[in-house]
UniProtKB/Swiss-Prot annotation:
GO terms for biological process: 'de novo' pyridoxal 5'-phosphate biosynthetic process; pyridoxine biosynthetic process. It is an enzyme of class 1 (oxidoreductase). It is found in: Cytoplasm. The lineage of its organism: Bacteria, Pseudomonadati, Pseudomonadota, Gammaproteobacteria, Enterobacterales. Homodimer. Catalyzes the oxidation of erythronate-4-phosphate to 3-hydroxy-2-oxo-4-phosphonooxybutanoate. The active site is at R208, E237, H254. Pathway: Cofactor biosynthesis; pyridoxine 5'-phosphate biosynthesis; pyridoxine 5'-phosphate from D-erythrose 4-phosphate: step 2/5. SUPFAM superfamilies: Formate/glycerate dehydrogenase catalytic domain-like, NAD(P)-binding Rossmann-fold domains. Substrate binds at S45, T66, Y258. NAD(+) binds at D146, T175, D232, G257. This is Erythronate-4-phosphate dehydrogenase. Keywords: Cytoplasm, NAD, Oxidoreductase, Pyridoxine biosynthesis. The gene is pdxB. Belongs to the D-isomer specific 2-hydroxyacid dehydrogenase family. PdxB subfamily.
Length: 378
């Protein structure tokens, strides 16, 4: 069997070569001629998978090592007998930690305590749910908005977007991109919503670029709107507005989910789905793939406060690195994709063992996602 894998999918060659002949291919653009004789195609979010790409091909299975699937026309795949599997939740932890790192950076810069803020989370799926849990573990009040879950009667105190815009100090977006229908999220944050924000609010988009009307956001900022903005995703990509980038507080190249652990989860999830599809199911232990982190252990001599938490978080990942890289490169054609293709290795907080001086700090850090223990207990 011939299996095409995105050249930037970690561990793909190593894993899929167990089950067939592997050929690494570019994700954007992916020339149709490379599909000749292929049985399976493994992609990332940069590849548009639809009739234009696959009509008349021999591909029987498509795997996307991503949580989102708006780049895949799964309706067409199903109608044409092509199996499809994605990797829901694979990068959720990475996105949560990106948001946390960004907020701690703004808190230090602007002189506030994150615990004193109310965070409105729009979209309570794999990312939003985990973010809610970690924020609460740090003592942050959260407000939740998720109309589909509210209408289904899911457990949770769900509020309207209007309520979050009114009452939350920070609004962070974690929805799928729906272009139409009752739960449309395309331009969910538009000029009307932006005008409703009180001065000093923080807006974060780390889901899909068009969930925020980028033109309306740029206009609002140009007109002096006092809004701190964190954008990891843009409208459009890769050709983002450099004028908008110049006005946001943190801007990155759609890399919020790009931890080594998140990428490895995505690859292993689609590998396991493919192995099931061909009748030779295999399970992969993530730990068997990952290397030792650059920083494996640190010892604390004081209880954890917000300043110390920021130092721990930024020891593992400091968002300012990626912000600086995008600002330096954004004016050059092709650099957005190059930053993603050659992304520097980044780990999750769980890769860092924190030896604490007290039980309360260890419990708190474990709840936040670190690997923590009390001195002498391990």
């Amino acid at each position: 069997m011939k299996i095409l894998v995105d050249e930037n999918m970690p561990y793909a060659r190593e894993l899929f070569s167990r089950l067939g002949e592997v050929q690494a291919v570019p994700g954007r653009p992916l020339p149709r001629e490379l599909l000749v004789g292929a049985d399976a195609l493994m992609v990332r979010s940069v590849t548009k998978v639809n009739a234009n790409l696959l009509f008349g091909s021999s591909v029987k299975f498509v795997g996307s090592a991503t949580a989102g699937t708006d780049h895949v026309d799964d309706t067409w795949l199903n109608a044409n007998g092509i199996a499809f599997s994605a990797a829901p939740g694979c990068n959720a932890i990475a996105v949560v930690e990106y948001v946390f790192s960004s907020l701690l950076m703004l808190a230090e810069r602007d002189g506030f305590q994150l615990r004193d803020k109310t965070v409105g989370i729009v979209g309570v799926g794999n990312v939003g749910r985990r973010l809610d849990t970690r924020l609460k573990a740090w003592g942050v009040k959260t407000l939740l908005c998720d109309p589909p879950r509210a209408d289904r009667g899911d457990a949770g105190d769900f509020l309207s977007l209007e309520t979050l815009v009114r009452d939350a100090d920070i609004l962070t977006l974690h929805t799928p991109l729906y272009l139409d229908g009752p739960y449309r999220t395309h331009h969910l944050v538009d000029a009307t919503v932006l005008n409703a924000f009180a001065d000093g609010r923080i807006l974060i988009n780390a889901c899909r670029g068009p969930v925020v009307d980028n033109a309306a956001l740029l206009e609002a900022l140009q007109q002096g709107k006092k809004l701190s903005v964190i954008l990891d995703v843009w409208e459009p990509e890769p050709g983002l507005s450099t004028d908008l980038l110049a006005r946001v507080d943190i801007g990155t190249a759609h890399i919020a989910g790009y931890t080594l652990e998140g990428k490895a989860r995505g690859t292993t999830q689609v590998f396991e789905a493919w192995s099931e599809f061909i009748g030779t199911p295999q399970q992969i232990a993530l730990s068997s793939l990952l290397p030792e982190p650059d920083y494996a252990e640190v010892t604390l001599t004081a209880p954890v406060d917000e300043a110390l938490l920021k130092r721990l978080v930024h020891l593992v990942y400091d968002v300012r690195r990626d912000d600086a890289l995008l600002r330096h490169a954004a004016h050059q054609e092709g650099e957005f994709d190059r930053l993603r293709k050659h992304y520097q290795e980044r780990r999750e907080w769980s890769s860092l063992h924190v030896i604490c001086a007290d039980v309360e700090s260890a419990d708190c850090l474990n709840a936040l996602g670190f690997n923590a223990s009390v001195r002498g207990a391990r």
